[in-house]
């Protein structure tokens, strides 16, 4: 097998891996969003029906929203759902367009690296502190940054590979 065929095989395996990871992230986000709804409903029922609102429900809902958002942001990067300046890029000559799109994805990947690193630093710093309403480490607030950052780097790399190969990343929800 020649080098080009090997590269194509690795590239397609990586694309399939990223597509599955993106689908898994979407499914997990949906499950977590349902958990947010249940948590908020439990709080409302507790407050208005039983006259005793559970103290943990709001804190859990806020925590879950962070995870849903982090997963959604990462999937948005893969599926090109993030804000972009398409009109300016489309006016450029083809040779410049490719270079600019690669630079954009490198910037997004750099952001993902910084976000993941910062999240990790804060998670390790806050590991010994407990969230009073949930009795879990404060670190759980920063883990979504790590997860989203890693996913953003993986998905940005997928876009760069696709651009260099002259391909497009197909959204995972297709």
Model-derived features: positions:
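Alpha-helical transmembrane segments and membrane-interface helix-loop junctions
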Residues: 1-174
């Amino acid at each position: 097998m020649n080098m080009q065929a090997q590269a194509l095989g690795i590239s397609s395996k990586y694309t399939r891996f990223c597509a599955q990871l993106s689908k898994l992230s979407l499914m997990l986000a949906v499950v977590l969003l349902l958990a947010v709804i249940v948590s908020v409903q439990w709080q409302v029922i507790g407050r208005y029906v039983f006259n005793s609102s559970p103290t943990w429900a709001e804190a859990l809902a806020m925590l879950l929203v962070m995870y849903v958002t982090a997963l959604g942001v990462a999937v948005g990067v893969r599926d090109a759902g993030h804000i972009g300046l398409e009109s300016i890029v489309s006016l450029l000559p083809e040779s410049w367009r490719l270079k600019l799109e690669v630079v954009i994805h490198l910037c997004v990947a750099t952001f993902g690296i910084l976000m993941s690193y910062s999240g990790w630093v804060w998670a390790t710093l806050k590991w010994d502190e407990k969230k009073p309403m949930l009795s879990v480490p404060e670190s759980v607030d920063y883990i979504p940054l790590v997860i989203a950052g890693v996913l953003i780097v993986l998905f940005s790399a997928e876009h760069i590979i696709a651009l260099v190969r002259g391909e497009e990343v197909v959204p995972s929800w297709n």
